[in-house]
């Protein structure tokens, strides 16, 4: 999806939500359909620990827009675009290679609960443990698929990865 990004990118950036927090369905935006489709119902008895989407106007090393996990006080519906700020990176890889996730929160004026979170170190350990557990196990029952979690990096690394992935205008 090619859209205008924020004027202060990568300090703040737009994320299209594909999967709401608490969902057991994996939805994906399909550019050729200009719509969100149901990719699959998760094979495991698990739900997404945060809202999941992608940063508009970016391309990661895998050729897809950068994945973003949006921590918020509410579940956000698929297709909604949220102005966010980066707080860190969850480094991981799957069966196809590097598959990092930018960690973000909505900007403070969108979700006031975000005001206390400035870096990944501000996320409570139990939430980081849930995120790690989810990504290490949600593909277990799917043949040939896996996800390996490597660790968390802070806000500066997230901003760097966003800047490097920005599509040329």
UniProtKB/Swiss-Prot annotation:
How does it associate, per the subunit comment?
Answer: Homohexamer.
- Residues bound to Mg(2+) 2 are 67
What cellular component terms from Gene Ontology apply here?
A: cytoplasm
Enumerate the NCBIfam families for this protein. PRK01250.1
- What PANTHER family does this protein's entry cite? INORGANIC PYROPHOSPHATASE
Question: What subcellular compartments does it reside in?
Answer: Cytoplasm
What is the main EC category here? hydrolase
Superkingdom of the source species: Archaea
Per its UniProt record, what SUPFAM superfamilies does this chain match?
Inorganic pyrophosphatase
Positions that bind Mg(2+) 1: 62, 67, 99
Provide the E.C. number(s) assigned to this enzyme: 3.6.1.1
Gene that encodes it: ppa
An example Pfam family from this entry, by short name, is Pyrophosphatase
Q: Which organism was this protein described from?
A: Thermoplasma volcanium (strain ATCC 51530 / DSM 4299 / JCM 9571 / NBRC 15438 / GSS1)
Question: Which reaction is this enzyme known to catalyze?
Answer: diphosphate + H2O = 2 phosphate + H(+)
| Residues annotated to bind substrate | 26, 40, 52, 138
Q: Provide the protein name.
A: Inorganic pyrophosphatase
Its needed co-factors are:
Mg(2+)
Family, per entry: Belongs to the PPase family.
Give the function comment from the record: Catalyzes the hydrolysis of inorganic pyrophosphate (PPi) forming two phosphate ions.
- Example GO BP: phosphate-containing compound metabolic process
Which key words are in the record? Cytoplasm, Hydrolase, Magnesium, Metal-binding
Q: Which HAMAP family match?
A: Inorganic_PPase
Q: Single GO molecular-function term?
A: magnesium ion binding
């Amino acid at each position: 999806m090619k859209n205008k990004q924020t004027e202060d990118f990568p300090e703040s950036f737009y994320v299209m939500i594909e999967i709401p927090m608490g969902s057991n369905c994996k939805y994906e935006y399909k550019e050729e359909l200009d719509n969100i489709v149901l990719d699959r119902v998760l094979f495991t008895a698990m739900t997404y620990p945060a809202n999941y989407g992608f940063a508009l106007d970016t391309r990661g090393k895998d050729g897809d827009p950068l994945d973003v996990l949006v921590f918020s006080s509410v579940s956000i519906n698929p297709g909604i675009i949220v102005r966010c700020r980066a707080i860190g990176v969850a480094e991981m890889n799957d069966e196809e290679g590097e598959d990092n996730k930018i960690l973000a929160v909505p900007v403070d004026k969108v979700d006031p609960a975000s005001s206390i979170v400035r870096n990944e170190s501000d996320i409570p350990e139990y939430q980081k443990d849930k995120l790690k557990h989810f990504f290490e196990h949600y593909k277990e029952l799917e043949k040939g698929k896996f996800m390996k979690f490597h660790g968390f990096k802070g806000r500066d690394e997230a901003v760097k990865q966003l800047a490097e992935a920005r599509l040329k205008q």
